[in-house]
């Protein structure tokens, strides 16, 4: 497949090595301090994490990390990341991984702008404000039978 860009209003960048341009994209949206969420250490072992973090630094974006997001993420991990985001003064959350990382990023982004317990959102409290959310690399793959 050929590289392409799509925006409606969500921007999608697709193509080889696009993860190495995350700093550029996030800088365009005004990100300055980002909490990076990821699942397993494979993200680091593959070099993907460092590629993304390096590009963020090259664009003047500070970052901290919270790894270990599991499938069917726990509220305790979300609360941990919310506390980190608040202490750091994050203005955005960057998800590297699959659906569980992205789901966690959404809860963290809302929780970081809320004075109560993030669990309140799951009980029906409406979200009034949230940090910016970026999904760097989706690890959700599709396998077709041959």
Where do the protein language model's features map onto the residues?
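An N-terminal, well-structured beta->alpha segment
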Residues: 1-61, 65-66
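Short coil-to-helix leader/linker segments, especially the first N-terminal amphipathic alpha-helix
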Residues: 9-17, 110-120
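A generic local structural motif
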Residues: 21-24, 79-81, 120-125
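Short coil/turn connectors at secondary-structure junctions
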Residues: 30-32, 88-92, 104, 128-134
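N-terminal small/polar loop signature for handling phosphorylated ligands or for N-terminal nucleophile
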Residues: 47-118
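Short, acidic/small-residue loops that bind anionic groups at enzyme active sites
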Residues: 114-139
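Conserved small/polar residues in nucleotide/adenosyl-binding loops
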Residues: 140-146
